[in-house]
A protein has these predicted regions:
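Walker A (P-loop) phosphate-binding loop of ABC-type ATPase nucleotide-binding domains
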Residues: 39-43
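Helix-to-loop junction immediately C-terminal to a conserved catalytic motif
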Residues: 52
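Conserved ABC ATPase "signature" region
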Residues: 99, 103, 109-124
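Conserved small/polar residues in nucleotide/adenosyl-binding loops
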Residues: 150-152
Length: 152
């Protein structure tokens, strides 16, 4: 049997008395395009944050390729994600932000210019991200998610 790329088993997250995710289980097979849909407040972002190790589940597990995200040696080489377009330091240029991401995940620096070109930010790559519009910030976030030749 092929190991799922993503798996959640009985994943639950509560905040105080509020249950944001309630015993969620699913698998995503390699090579499949999978949507994750639901109304506001359904727990989509919370689930993604648990998969990415940003929030600890109250119970259950979420794995990437059979491993907890926190156990991945170079996670950005396996997983690309964009949860918030505004987490870039406002005084860092788009290029330097991506260089930092590449360096900390053992990704060749040449990939930085490739993804800047993919998302149409080459002409503003040396500008401070704090001056970017929402759309430009979202494209920079997407560039970060695409930085590696990702599996997920």
């Amino acid at each position: 049997m092929v190991e799922p790329m993503l798996a959640a088993a009985d994943l639950t997250k509560t905040f105080g008395g509020v249950t944001a995710v309630d015993h969620l289980s699913f698998t995503v097979a390699p090579g499949r395009v999978t949507g994750f849909l639901g109304p506001n407040g359904a727990g989509k972002s919370t689930t993604m944050r648990m998969i990415l190790g940003l929030d600890r589940p109250t119970s259950g597990t979420a794995t990437v390729g059979g491993q907890l995200y926190r156990d991945l040696r170079h996670p950005l080489r396996q997983v690309g994600a964009l949860l918030d377009a505004h987490w870039v330091h406002p005084n860092r240029s788009a290029r330097n932000h991506l260089r930092w991401m590449a360096a900390t995940n053992d990704i060749p620096e040449r990939r930085v210019d490739e993804v800047l070109d993919m998302v149409g930010l080459t002409s503003v790559a040396n500008q401070r991200a704090g001056g970017f519009s929402l759309g430009m910030s979202q494209r920079l976030g997407l560039a970060g998610a695409l930085l590696s030749l990702i599996h997920i």
